[in-house]
Amino acid sequence: MFMATDKGTVKKTNLEDFNSARKVGLIAITLDENEQLIGVELTDGNSEIILATRNGIAIRFDEQDVRPMGRTAHGVRGIQLNYGDEVVAMDSVTSENSEVLTATEQGLGKRTSVSEYRKQTRGGKGVINIKVNEKTGIVIGMKVITPGQEIMTVSYTHLRAHET
């Protein structure tokens, strides 16, 4: 299981560590004050991870760069964030022909081949994913998709279905 927080922290924990669930639940990750969990992925241990930030930066790295940790561990740095930036989305990549779909608050979307995101080591600065400005607004989401996958976008005023 792979987790990411808005502060750029990532953590990998073996699923077997959650076998002894109780009625009150289990601690999966220790968060700092004002830190939020933004994503959890079930991975095979050999995937690649992409993190996307609100200011248009993304990083792609091997899941194997993160060692498995115990349930109560905090995690390690997945991306080095610029001041005021935060991670808004995380996804795993299982195929090199996948694409990254990035959405902004002004309703714009960008579809980019995963191969255009050079692979870095965990904790790097990342690359420009999408230029953020007044026209685009900040990044609100990112998802790894496959060619031909149907995508539905929903906003407060429109409902659209697109086949990509």
Predicted regions, residues:
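Conserved structured catalytic cores and adjacent interaction surfaces
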Residues: 1-127, 136-150, 156
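Conserved small/polar residues in nucleotide/adenosyl-binding loops
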Residues: 157-164
